[in-house]
């Protein structure tokens, strides 16, 4: 995990560098609009550091907060985090209870005044099969959603409890119930009933812990053309802003290259026109 150094002024330099980096990325207009995170490795991190599993999950929350701050400062519109899989209910009752308690505390925290939602104008959406949550937690979810519903700058989708298969099943049921008899149904119809409907399409998916699978997360969205997937060999609590900044930078360069390539296909590229397509017949030769 990236930690502050004891060098005088280190925190100030890091903050200053992050601000410059974020402004540069925003100005490039090549930032991913929607980033998804599979935050894997909290339990292994706890074992590695010989700490309680709950402490591992708490370390993961700290990492998530730092990563999301960088994303929103850099201009990312939507972040979707895989907080709790429906499959996780199969874990020990002690761990499930601990995760639910932690979720309740953190949902309250990120919606408090001065915290993530307030600081960056983030609208909180809890997506998944909410019928699996107890009444007290559902009330915290309702308050978080209600408190942030008028925030327009960015969105945070918290998948809790969630699986991609359940999301698709939910979308199919909603389509059947709401669609008029005899009307055509296509991919866009189904997409309009996904939990992520109304936010930009997924651009970038990041998974930690060195595992090469999606683990039933955003499986419909990740299948779209152009989605970049980053599989990292570090555990989630070890994933920090510096590595995230590098990923955003790579994405920006890649998108910039594709945009330039597209313009070259549509028309000649000219530095005098900032790369806009030009008509050779109208261009005067010196």
Curated annotation (Swiss-Prot):
Q: Give the bilayer topology.
A: Peripheral membrane protein
Which GO biological process entries does UniProt record here? dolichol biosynthetic process; endoplasmic reticulum to Golgi vesicle-mediated transport; protein glycosylation
Lineage of the species this protein comes from? Eukaryota, Fungi, Dikarya, Ascomycota, Saccharomycotina
Q: Which organism is it from?
A: Saccharomyces cerevisiae (strain ATCC 204508 / S288c)
Q: GO MF terms on file?
A: ditrans,polycis-polyprenyl diphosphate synthase [(2E,6E)-farnesyl diphosphate specific] activity; prenyltransferase activity
Q: What is this protein called?
A: Dehydrodolichyl diphosphate synthase complex subunit RER2
Other remarks on this protein? Present with 8970 molecules/cell in log phase SD medium.
| Classification via InterPro entries | UPP_synth-like, UPP_synth-like_CS, UPP_synth-like_sf
* CDD domains membership: Cis_IPPS
Known catalysed reaction(s)?
n isopentenyl diphosphate + (2E,6E)-farnesyl diphosphate = a di-trans,poly-cis-polyprenyl diphosphate + n diphosphate
């Amino acid at each position: 995990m990236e930690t502050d150094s004891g060098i005088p002024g280190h925190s100030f330099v890091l903050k200053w560098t992050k601000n410059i980096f974020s402004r540069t990325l925003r100005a490039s207009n090549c930032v991913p609009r929607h980033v998804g995170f599979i935050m894997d490795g909290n339990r292994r991190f706890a074992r590695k550091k010989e700490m309680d599993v709950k402490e591992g999950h708490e370390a993961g929350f700290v990492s998530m907060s730092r990563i999301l701050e960088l994303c929103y400062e850099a201009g990312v519109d939507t972040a979707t985090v895989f907080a709790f899989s429906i499959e996780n209910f199969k874990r020990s009752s002690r761990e499930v209870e601990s995760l639910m308690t932690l979720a309740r505390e953190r949902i309250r925290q990120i919606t408090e005044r001065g915290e993530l939602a307030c600081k960056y104008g983030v609208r909180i959406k809890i997506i998944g099969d909410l019928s699996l949550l107890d009444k007290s937690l559902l009330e915290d979810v309702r308050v978080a959603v209600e408190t942030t519903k008028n925030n327009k700058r960015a969105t945070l989708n918290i998948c809790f409890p969630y699986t991609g298969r359940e999301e698709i099943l939910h979308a199919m049921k909603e389509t059947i119930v709401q669609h008029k008899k005899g009307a055509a149904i296509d991919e866009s119809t189904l997409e309009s009933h996904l939990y992520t409907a109304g936010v930009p399409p997924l651009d970038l998916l990041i998974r930690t812990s060195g595992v090469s699978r999606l683990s039933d997360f955003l499986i419909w969205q990740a299948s779209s053309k152009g989605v970049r997937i980053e599989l990292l060999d570090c555990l989630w609590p070890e994933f920090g802003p510096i590595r995230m900044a590098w990923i955003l930078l790579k994405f920006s360069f890649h998108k910039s290259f594709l945009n330039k390539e597209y313009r070259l296909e549509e028309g000649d590229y000219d530095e005098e026109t900032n790369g806009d397509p030009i008509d050779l017949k109208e261009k005067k030769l010196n």
